[in-house]
């Protein structure tokens, strides 16, 4: 972004005839087209990719499992980011102005925080689910049931929505920073200034679950490695049917854990720059240039578009489900009971 200044061609007001209007930074037509394509592609992928995930899991009975219900709910959170957050943030970033009103700015910010925290909660519960599944695959079905999954999903939605609504609709997030907030929030702007206390709470809310997930997945892969060695050592011996079944179940759960582990890592990488930037701004006087802030935001937003790509890369059943949905076979009465899995696990 060192060439950022070369992209700027003019400076004018967002609302030329209104006092207190924000300054609009205009980019060259070519740059604007490129930015709209890049951001628009992310929004479209987040909407339609996650919509495919939700339809796949909810329609095909073979995919009705506690883990997949969590994945579908996670896809719903990412879908809502693509619908309610990314399109409006795209216009704000490219036009450097907010044209949707002050009330919608608050709603947009609230949705941004709520749905992103909802994703984090879902991933944390998925990590716990995978830990139980890999460490004790035969007992797992009795521990992590559909009702338990439903409780996890409810918590993953209710707490973030309550937290986000309470913080942004009461105005407590900028206590002590009212002058700075008034200066930044000119007419045509939608910049949320958060004080140190709330930034610290936000960062702890990100780093603590992240640390828990790292520990869980670290243990998962240690257990998976031990299981793989055990299977390898007993491979030449005659296995009983129960031992063979346990090996197949363990192999399947390890594969699922690997895929969902990639999803967790992608989330961490996407959100880490934004979390660090928030800390720097809160404790060093909001020194981050606007374009750095926008890059951090869009790295985080793009995470909502990544998960469907990860599923398509690692899950053959998801690729098959997409084919069935796109070709219209999903409209057949028998499609819900279709076999999406290969014979070999």
Curated annotation (Swiss-Prot):
Coiled-coil region(s): none
Membrane-side (Extracellular) residue stretches: 1-32, 90-107, 169-202, 277-282
Transmembrane regions listed in the UniProt entry: 33-53, 69-89, 108-128, 148-168, 203-223, 260-276, 283-302
Alphabetical list of SMART domains matching this protein: 7TM_GPCR_Srsx
MF terms (GO), sorted A to Z: trace-amine receptor activity
Keyword annotations of the record: Cell membrane, Disulfide bond, G-protein coupled receptor, Glycoprotein, Membrane, Receptor, Transducer, Transmembrane, Transmembrane helix
Keyword Transferase among record annotations: no
Subcellular location: Cell membrane
GO CC terms in record: plasma membrane
SUPFAM superfamilies: Family A G protein-coupled receptor-like
Disulfide bonds: 22-186, 105-190
Sites carrying sugar chains: 4, 19
Residues on Cytoplasmic side: 54-68, 129-147, 224-259, 303-345
InterPro entries: GPCR_Rhodpsn, GPCR_Rhodpsn_7TM, TAAR, TAAR_fam
Gene Ontology terms: biological process: adenylate cyclase-activating G protein-coupled receptor signaling pathway; G protein-coupled receptor signaling pathway
Entry function: Olfactory receptor specific for trace amines, such as beta-phenylethylamine (beta-PEA). Trace amine compounds are enriched in animal body fluids and act on trace amine-associated receptors (TAARs) to elicit both intraspecific and interspecific innate behaviors. Beta-PEA-binding causes a conformation change that triggers signaling via G(s)-class of G alpha proteins (GNAL or GNAS).
Family recorded in the similarity comment: Belongs to the G-protein coupled receptor 1 family.
Record's comment describing the protein's domains: In addition to the well known disulfide bond common to G-protein coupled receptor 1 family, trace amine-associated receptors (TAARs) contain an unique disulfide bond (Cys-22-Cys-186) connecting the N-terminus to the extracellular Loop 2 (ECL2), which is required for agonist-induced receptor activation.
This protein's name: Trace amine-associated receptor 6
Organism this protein belongs to: Pan troglodytes (Chimpanzee)
UniProt lineage: Eukaryota, Metazoa, Chordata, Craniata, Vertebrata
Gene designation per UniProt: TAAR6
């Amino acid at each position: 972004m060192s060439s950022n200044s070369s992209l700027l061609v003019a400076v004018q007001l967002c609302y030329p005839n209104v006092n207190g209007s924000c300054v609009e930074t205009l980019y060259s037509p070519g740059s604007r087209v490129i930015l709209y394509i890049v951001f628009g592609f992310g929004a479209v992928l987040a909407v339609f990719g996650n919509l495919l995930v939700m339809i796949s899991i909810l329609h095909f009975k073979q995919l009705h499992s506690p883990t997949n219900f969590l994945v579908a709910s996670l896809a719903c959170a990412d879908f809502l980011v693509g619908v309610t957050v990314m399109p409006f943030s795209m216009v704000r970033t490219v036009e450097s102005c907010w044209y949707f009103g002050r009330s919608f700015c608050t709603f947009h910010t609230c949705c941004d925080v709520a749905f992103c925290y909802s994703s984090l909660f879902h991933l944390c519960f998925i990590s716990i689910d995978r830990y139980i599944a890999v460490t004790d695959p035969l007992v797992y079905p009795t521990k992590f049931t559909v009702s338990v999954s439903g409780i996890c999903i409810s918590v993953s939605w209710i707490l973030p929505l309550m937290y986000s609504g309470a913080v942004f609709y009461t105005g407590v997030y900028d206590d002590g920073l009212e002058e700075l907030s008034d200066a930044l929030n000119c007419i045509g702007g939608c910049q949320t200034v958060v004080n140190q206390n709330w930034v610290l709470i936000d960062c702890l809310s990100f780093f603590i679950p992240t640390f828990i997930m790292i520990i869980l997945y670290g243990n998962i892969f240690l257990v998976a490695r031990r299981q793989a060695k055990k299977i390898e050592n007993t491979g030449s011996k005659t296995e009983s049917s129960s031992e063979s079944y346990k090996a197949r179940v363990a192999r399947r759960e390890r594969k699922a854990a690997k895929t969902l582990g990639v999803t967790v890592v992608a989330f961490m990488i996407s959100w880490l720059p934004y979390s660090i930037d928030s800390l720097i701004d809160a404790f060093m006087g909001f020194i981050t240039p606007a374009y750095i802030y926008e890059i951090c935001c869009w790295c985080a937003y793009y995470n909502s578009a990544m998960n469907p790509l990860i599923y398509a890369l690692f899950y053959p059943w998801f690729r098959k489900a997409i084919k069935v949905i796109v070709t219209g076979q999903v409209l057949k009465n028998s499609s819900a009971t279709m076999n999406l899995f290969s014979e070999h696990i």
